[in-house]
Amino acid sequence: FLGTINLSLCEQERDADEEERRDEPDGSNVEVEKRFLSHIAGFLSNLFGK
């Protein structure tokens, strides 16, 4: 029962996110850049032992 509710809420959030992305075509690019930069920062941090 709780799994069904959780799945339903996740679907609603995903639908809301997709609607926002349609409203702002550049919004998805910003998200990709943020993820990419965070991965690069993590890699450099591990590389230099910080």
From Swiss-Prot:
It holds the Pfam family FSAP_sig_propep. Keywords: Amidation, Amphibian defense peptide, Antibiotic, Antimicrobial, Cleavage on pair of basic residues, Fungicide, Immunity, Innate immunity, Membrane, Secreted, Signal, Target cell membrane, Target membrane. One of its GO terms (cellular component) is extracellular region. Residues 1-10 form the signal peptide. One of its GO terms (biological process) is killing of cells of another organism. Residues 11-35 form a propeptide. It is found in: Secreted; Target cell membrane. Expressed by the skin glands. The modification Phenylalanine amide is found at F48. It comes from the Eukaryota. Transmembrane segments: none annotated. The keyword DNA-binding does not apply. Amphipathic alpha-helical antimicrobial peptide with potent activity against some Gram-positive bacteria (MIC=4->80 uM), potent activity against fungi (MIC=10-20 uM), and no activity against Gram-negative bacteria. Does not display anti-leishmania activity. Does not show hemolytic activity (LC(50)>80 uM). Belongs to the frog skin active peptide (FSAP) family. Temporin subfamily. This is Temporin-SHc. The lineage of its organism: Eukaryota, Metazoa, Chordata, Craniata, Vertebrata.
